[in-house]
From Swiss-Prot:
This is Pi-stichotoxin-Hmg5a. Keywords: Acetylcholine receptor inhibiting toxin, Cleavage on pair of basic residues, Disulfide bond, Ion channel impairing toxin, Nematocyst, Neurotoxin, Postsynaptic neurotoxin, Proton-gated sodium channel impairing toxin, Secreted, Signal, Toxin. Belongs to the sea anemone type 3 (BDS) potassium channel toxin family. The keyword Signal applies. It holds the Pfam family Defensin_4. The keyword Secreted applies. Residues 1-21 form the signal peptide. It comes from the Eukaryota. GO terms for cellular component: extracellular region; nematocyst. GO terms for molecular function: sodium channel inhibitor activity; toxin activity. It is found in: Secreted; Nematocyst. A synonymy between H.magnifica and R.crispa is controversial.
Length: 77
């Protein structure tokens, strides 16, 4: 019984610590967070490497793509 209570208190303390430690950034909350990818080369152009997908994602303005190691390199020309 004591171990269960101790484990419960430890879990509550971890949740409180994690909640307090998270940044309260307004840009993060407004959805303005910008994701950055790894640069890659595609037909002489520098693009963004997307891991574990076969096509460039829609809505990002990519108009050139090359297959890359376990993913795709997407370029905005």
């Amino acid at each position: 019984m004591d171990y269960q209570r101790l484990l419960f208190l430890f879990a509550v303390a971890m949740v409180i610590t994690t909640t307090v430690a998270l940044p309260q950034d307004t840009a993060l909350m407004d959805g303005q967070l910008q994701k950055r990818g790894t640069p890659c080369k595609c037909l002489g152009y520098t693009g963004v490497y997307w891991f574990m997908i076969t096509r460039c994602p829609n809505g990002h303005g990519y108009n050139l793509s090359c297959p890359y190691f376990l993913g795709v390199c997407c370029v905005k020309k």
